[in-house]
């Protein structure tokens, strides 16, 4: 009994002194516009208060300030402002604190200061030179990191909202940090993770030409492989391509936005998958026994400042206990428990049974279909400039058909193509005409062109050496006598026959045939370029010796450079050469002349990728007739051919193929036994040395032609 009275007394004392714990009262809220599109909120209390703790939310854009020990005495919870960047202010009192929520049009920075019983909140950037009360900046010690070189030391940055620089750094723990310098700290990207890539989209933000590059950061040994920056119209996109398992964090300090990608283990990835949560709403707690479901929906709507429309069929009670649960998850739990569904239109939340919502949407679709079937037909001529009108018309009919049978409009209207003017004549309802114009505007664009330049380099070096000897002689019973005539010096026998001092060749100086036998050792150098002959004569014997030598060197280089321009995904071919004729015999014995092509040709099919790289299917041939090795008057064809499919950057030169051949040979022809004798064997053999080197290289350089280059080319 006494213990029960004690607990009751403690409860009464707590109830009596609970209001005293909230020492300060918020009595007044004033708003004033400041220069530089800034807004000042002045909060007046009945006594001094401590500095608030706050945070910002990006979507929806808002600033939240927590005022500990403060009661709301304003008499209202919501107040519309519509001053500068601020839309409204919401003051919510919970337990021992009061939360001030400032709803913004776009996320902006803010500062706070306390002066006596007043708290000032300034929303917006401070003007240059203004003094803003804030904590003194602390200079952090730089952590050791590996830095990628900036793309350009001082890139040109356009005025307004723009990206100033993009850099890459490697952190201490192997994480890859993509550092983006912004011209305005209020720039906020839309971040998406799709297809294993992290994409940051900056709306109404310019990107200097110097920063529109693709960074290859594989060598930094981080999960990041590439960082690609591009711009289209007034939108800038930065795509980060990591590999393997990773986790990323995005944070911003002043004008610097950092995307940190760190590697993950398999265990971390499994844990992250389990912890992945689809609900992001502000957390709340609900604890009710047998409460009307409409009341729960009203509580959630009040908590989120949403307008609620509930169907009359939403009925029944529910018991729930939820602690620190996101409000959107709590709403889904309530709806699923009672078989309900929701539709959100702006800031209005519509709740009804799932069957009722589905039936209503089916009725709306049927009504729209009936309206479309009764819509008047209009005729319009749409000019197509670059594409084929027939292709676009066929594509339009296929994408707007129902199951490939008939059009959405039940076969009403017609699509006709005029090939002469490359135009589409459409007789369709206005809705389909608008859709046709959108398709034409997206598909009727100039085809990009590519110039392909190939270089075929042939280099050869040759060296030939030959050294040989010839022995010969003649025997005569009589005596020899000498002669000299027409520059020839030799000997003459008794019969008047002449023998010159060439091994074994006894001939008349001008006419006649040889009388002596052939040389008994004929190992002279082939195609000799020099030689020396020695003769030994007795009364009836002549002995001749001829030493001959040949040495030949040579080198050459042939460079062929074909070029061709073609459209994206179109095949082009250029050919230069000749056709070699040759005779063919038929089974009947008749002959006919045929031709074999021997030419230099380049055949390519380029494909431009979305990141301005080029996939090239290429075939390069260089055939030439070999007239030095003709057979039956027909030269063979020396063929050089390369077939490849490669991926290359715009303007980059790549070697797509090469052949190197080295031919070395050494041969010795000699007289058995005599050719093996030391020293003397040199007089009975012929040595030949050959060394030839040939190299073929094929280079390819594709370049994407812009509109200006095409105009100059014309």
From Swiss-Prot:
Transmembrane regions: none
Listed Pfam families: AMIN, Secretin, Secretin_N, STN
InterPro entries tied to this protein: AMIN_dom (IPR021731), GspD/PilQ (IPR001775), NolW-like (IPR005644), NolW-like_sf (IPR038591), Pilus_4_PilQ (IPR013355), Secretin/TonB_short_N (IPR011662), T2SS/T3SS_dom (IPR004846), T2SS_GspD_CS (IPR004845)
Domain of life: Bacteria
Record-level GO cellular component terms: cell outer membrane
GO terms classed as biological process: protein secretion; type IV pilus assembly
Main location (coarse class): membrane
Signal peptide annotation: 1-24
Compartment(s) of residence: Cell outer membrane
Record key words, sorted: Cell outer membrane, Fimbrium biogenesis, Membrane, Protein transport, Signal, Transport
Family: Belongs to the bacterial secretin family. PilQ subfamily.
Function, as annotated: Essential for the formation of pili. Involved in the biogenesis of type 4 fimbriae probably by serving as a 'porthole' allowing passage of the fimbrae through the outer membrane.
Stated name of the protein: Fimbrial assembly protein PilQ
Lineage: Bacteria, Pseudomonadati, Pseudomonadota, Gammaproteobacteria, Pseudomonadales
